């Protein structure tokens, strides 16, 4: 009804305000001097130090952290998040393809074994992962940041469920046309999976970008510092 629709709009606006206002207050406060904020508290309106504050933080090493600029830290996070998202999509695509389309013995058991890894806390895996990266001399490298968290059970689950929804007739028709397994994967499944690939990539990019605990342990070189390691 019109009344319920209007009430829904009110709730949407309230939800939007709850999400946006705190972010705006943080941004507005960042345009004031630290002395002003310490004296008067957080601010709702913009201050006079916008250009000075942000140019110092983004481009000057002394503005945020003594040996690296915020711009470099954002670049590090972007590289890490892109690497994690890309490798997660690739490994999950291939894992799901093998589990669904190859006659693998105990395929369902293997899938659930992969899926159960979601129940293993990150804290439990950190030290073994660090030891492996250390023995491979990958500590303080982008590879060391990316590889241990680039395989995703949840992404494999999404692709597996998507592949199981594709009719078996498509595979049979491809076989009749002489298409091998690799060509079927590249020419048929990947184009059909574009929407799912985009969704998983975005999900894993955000997951990688927001990493805190693993980079905190595996990075000691300042030039690899991430924003989350300085602001959390």
Regions picked out by a protein language model, each given a short descriptive name:
Residues 9-224:
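A structural signal for multi-pass alpha-helical bundles of membrane permease subunits
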Residues 1-11, 223-232:
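Single conserved hydrophobic/aromatic residue that forms the stacking wall/gate
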């Amino acid at each position: 009804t019109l009344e319920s629709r209007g009430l829904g709009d009110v709730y949407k606006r309230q939800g939007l305000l709850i999400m946006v206002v705190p972010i705006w207050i943080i941004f507005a406060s960042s345009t004031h001097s630290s002395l002003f904020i310490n004296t008067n508290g957080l601010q709702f309106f913009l201050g006079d130090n916008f250009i000075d504050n942000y140019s110092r933080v983004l481009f000057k090493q002394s503005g945020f952290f003594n040996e690296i600029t915020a711009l470099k830290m954002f670049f590090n996070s972007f590289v890490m998040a892109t690497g994690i998202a890309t490798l997660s999509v690739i490994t999950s695509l291939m894992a799901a393809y093998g589990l669904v389309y190859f006659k693998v013995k105990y395929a369902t058991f293997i899938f659930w074994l992969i899926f159960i890894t979601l129940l293993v806390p990150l804290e439990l895996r950190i030290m073994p992962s660090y030891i492996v990266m250390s023995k491979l001399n990958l500590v303080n490298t982008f590879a060391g940041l990316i590889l241990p968290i680039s395989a995703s059970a949840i992404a494999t689950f999404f692709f597996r469920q998507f592949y199981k929804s594709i009719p078996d007739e498509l595979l049979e028709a491809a076989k009749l046309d002489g298409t091998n397994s690799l060509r079927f994967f590249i020419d048929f499944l990947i184009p059909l999976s574009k929407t799912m690939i985009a969704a998983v990539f975005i999900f894993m990019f955000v997951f990688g970008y927001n990493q805190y605990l693993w980079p905190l342990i595996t990075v000691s070189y300042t030039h690899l510092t991430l924003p989350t390691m300085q602001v959390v």
